[in-house]
Amino acid sequence: MPKSRERWIDEVRQTLQQAGFFVSDAHGVRPSSFDLAARRDATLLLVKVLKNIDALDADEAARLLELGRLFPAIVLVIGRTSGASELAPGVVYTRYSVPIISQETLQEYLDKALPPFLYASPGGTFARVDGERLRGLRVTRGLSLGALAGIAGVSRRAIQLYEEGAGAEVEVIERIERFLGEPIVRPIDLFEPRRVRGPEAPDDTPAGRAPGRAAERVARLRPRTGDALRDGMIAQLDGMGLEVVVTARAPFDALAHTPDVLLASTGSLRAALHRAEVLHSLARVAEGHAMFIVREAVHRAVIAGLPILNVEELKRHRDPDDLLEEIAEREGR
């Protein structure tokens, strides 16, 4: 019987926890740009779980990458299939610059310290060549570019590109390694803001940032809800000199830097009761703060660790330090 999405998210959560990550509660917001936030030391992850990775479209990828830029965090999708095919273990896939791996690849990376070496591209399966090592081995063996090209079955120009760190097809790498008797590929570190791209795209697009015009795409996707409470909160934070970004498909309405991350949501007290644990959990994982703004009078300063302020309380604060001092006090920090 197929796993439910909730069970699968919980399995990914447990895998991260067992590897020493502090993981947020599953927030249950649908649709959402990410399902889990996880931190280990200085590494913060935003993880999205998808059955079929082809469901990740350009707009959703742009939202996820933008959140990764804002926190900042490494974004990662855990998938199961691409079309009708299972994702191969040990292979990194990409959609719109978002790195994607299978649950098995994640477990091997965390439990056995086995990083993936391969990445998928429309042209096949590739690996990134350790160019400096390849050049050193070629020179030491007294091989010319042409000689090694003949052994590998590629052009001299291809060998030059490999020595500059370009990717090569698995079959080509196998021929070179078989002849040299030495490995020449570089592992992919999933938790570094690195380049995980196929040869069909420029190699200077980091996986943790939106490619090309994605910033424009995100700006277009940001909602103009006309919600007076939300707009008032954003205007108030903006008036304090904070950079405020309105979010969509996230368990919070806005994100600001103070310079710590400040997650903010608006709504009724009933909504605050429903979302308090999730927001508080996300703020703790991000090593930031969170607050919930309501219209009605507040009789409880904190719900499940989340500071609750009404509009008038927010308006009393004229600068970020003053606001953060009250939030931290209510959080008990």
Specify the residue positions occupied by each region the protein language model found:
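Residues within the helices of the helix-turn-helix
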Residues: 135-136, 146
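Conserved catalytic cores of phosphodiester-cleaving nucleases, focusing on short active-site segments
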Residues: 16, 34-69, 73-76, 237, ...
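Charged, structured surface patches that assemble and position nucleic-acid processing machinery
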Residues: 7, 12-15, 71-74, 79-80, ...
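Recognition helix of helix-turn-helix/homeodomain-like DNA-binding domains
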Residues: 152-168
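DNA major-groove recognition helix of helix-turn-helix/homeodomain DNA-binding modules
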Residues: 171-186
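The alpha-helix within a helix-turn-helix
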Residues: 138, 149, 177
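Short alpha-helical DNA-recognition segment
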Residues: 142-156
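Acidic-basic catalytic patches of nuclease active cores, encompassing PD-(D/E)XK
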Residues: 1-27, 183-250, 327-333
